[in-house]
């Protein structure tokens, strides 16, 4: 038989983690003792990576909040005197979009030093033209550079702190721990490339 501690269940949110635990408990209550059910490992991707990295001493446990990323983006735009827009428009519209773009790119493990400026500008222009953008070629190329600069400035601003994407990337680089015989991923079709690598790394 399979030992409960050899089972790892992974979800994307804390809410889903609780729902999964409740479902397992309800379905298993009459078949297995509660003490065995409690030994099943149920985590979010981030909590699993965080626990391993802190227990192993790879990170201090300080997590960067969303406000730090937003402030870093705004600070970079202002330092470069980027974009001829009002501050309220930059703060309310552009910064959130840049923040989401950075998180999306990091979810694929792409760091700012891996981005080729000319190629990025080319791809941005192609994508923008396909959507009949109102922005000029010069504006699109300039914004691409400002985006990469903001991303780099954010990465440079961190010391011992990590954000949620860093956690997953660091886990992949550092994990030498135990593997699980059975790994169950809730909503597996929603995994990105980094999360898929984590599952492959921890599954026997």
Spans of features found by a protein language model:
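Short alpha-helix boundary/capping elements
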Residues: 16, 49, 106-110, 175-176, ...
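Post-Walker A helix-loop "phosphate-sensing" segment adjacent to the P-loop in P-loop NTPases
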Residues: 1-5
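Conserved helicase NTPase motor core
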Residues: 41, 136-204
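Coupling/switch/interface segments within P-loop NTPase motor domains and analogous charged loops
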Residues: 67-156
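A general structural motif at alpha-helix termini
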Residues: 11, 24, 119, 168-171
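Short, mixed-charge, low-aromatic patches
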Residues: 26-31, 124-130, 183-193
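Conserved P-loop NTPase-based nucleic-acid remodeling module centered on helicase motor cores
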Residues: 6, 11-103
